[in-house]
Regions:
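Intrinsically disordered, low-complexity N-terminal segments that are enriched in acidic
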Residues: 1-45
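Low-complexity, flexible helical/coil segments
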Residues: 15, 69-77, 178-179, 235-236
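Tryptophan-centered motif/residue detector
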Residues: 22-24, 107, 197, 207
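Extracellular structured ligand-interaction cores
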Residues: 30-36, 195-197, 207
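Secondary-structure boundary elements
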Residues: 31-33, 37-137, 145-148
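Short, low-complexity, polar/charged sequence segments that are solvent-exposed and flexible
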Residues: 52-61, 178-179, 217-220, 228-231
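Active-site neighborhood of thiol-dependent amide/isopeptide-bond enzymes
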Residues: 93, 97-102, 106-196, 203, ...
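A recognition module on extended beta-rich or small alphabeta surfaces enriched in W/G with H and D/E
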Residues: 189-190, 197-237
Length: 237
């Protein structure tokens, strides 16, 4: 619905992200466009369900062409210089990709904090964050650090941008607002629900979700320390 001339959703971009394009008459006094979507969600809980409990990487790891894209550096996701230095220090001599990812995630949980003064979700400039030593930010900043360190450690990783769809029922016992919220009828106002999380790829398994930033967000909202049992429970989840 609306007074647009044309509107469509396309995935014709480098990362296949669904993007809405719309045009209006240049003289339109008001630009209206209403979109209705039916969303289906599912839980992805590989750690909770023990799906990776006995994970062992293949002897010879070969990534497909599309996965190899997520090993490459970008403008904000550098994989050399200070990023590589941090990655090497964090993972040490570990060779198992899952354990390397866990070391990186735990390092971020232990060392990074959420800064609510950051505009939007942050810009995710990892090199700047590590160079300045100001280990703070919002979701794009914190989860981009995970992605950069993972790539620098030889693990394909990517940011996933989207919108929280309401309350996270399973995480509500740790925080009523940090992971999304809804009213008494279960209806959520998603206009402020923009979020960036991350995923890393394990050969022989697939993409694994990780959200170091939400641990920092919960800590700030609930005034929890890194060592608090709730912090560690959310980090493990």
């Amino acid at each position: 619905e609306g007074n647009y001339l044309d509107a469509y959703v396309t995935e014709n971009n480098k990362y296949g992200a669904k993007t809405l394009f719309a045009t209006w008459d240049k003289d339109a006094q008001k630009r209206d466009l209403k979109i209705t979507m039916v969303i289906e969600t599912k839980d992805r809980e590989p750690m909770v369900k023990g799906a990776l409990e006995n994970y062992k990487p293949p002897k010879d790891i070969h990534y497909s062409v599309d996965v190899q894209e997520y090993l490459k550096p970008t403008q904000h996701i550098k994989t050399d210089g200070i990023v590589k230095q941090f990655a090497d220090k964090i993972v040490g001599t570990e060779t198992n990709p899952l354990k390397k990812a866990e070391l990186i995630h735990q390092w971020i949980v232990n060392n990074m904090e959420r800064d609510n003064s950051v505009l939007g979700c942050g810009d995710g400039d990892v090199e700047k964050i590590l160079t300045t030593g100001v280990l703070k930010g919002k979701c794009t900043d914190i989860n981009s650090v995970f992605v950069a360190l993972a790539r620098a450690s030889g693990i394909p990783a990517r940011e996933i941008f989207g919108i929280r769809l309401g309350a996270a029922d399973k995480m509500g016992k740790y925080s009523k607002g940090a992971f999304g919220s809804a009213d008494e009828h279960g209806v959520a106002n998603v206009s402020g629900g923009q979020h960036c999380r991350a995923e890393f790829y394990l050969a022989g398994f697939g993409w694994v979700p990780v959200d170091s930033a939400d641990v920092a967000k919960m800590r700030l909202a609930e005034k929890k320390s890194v060592d608090d049992k709730d912090t560690q429970a959310v980090a493990k989840y």
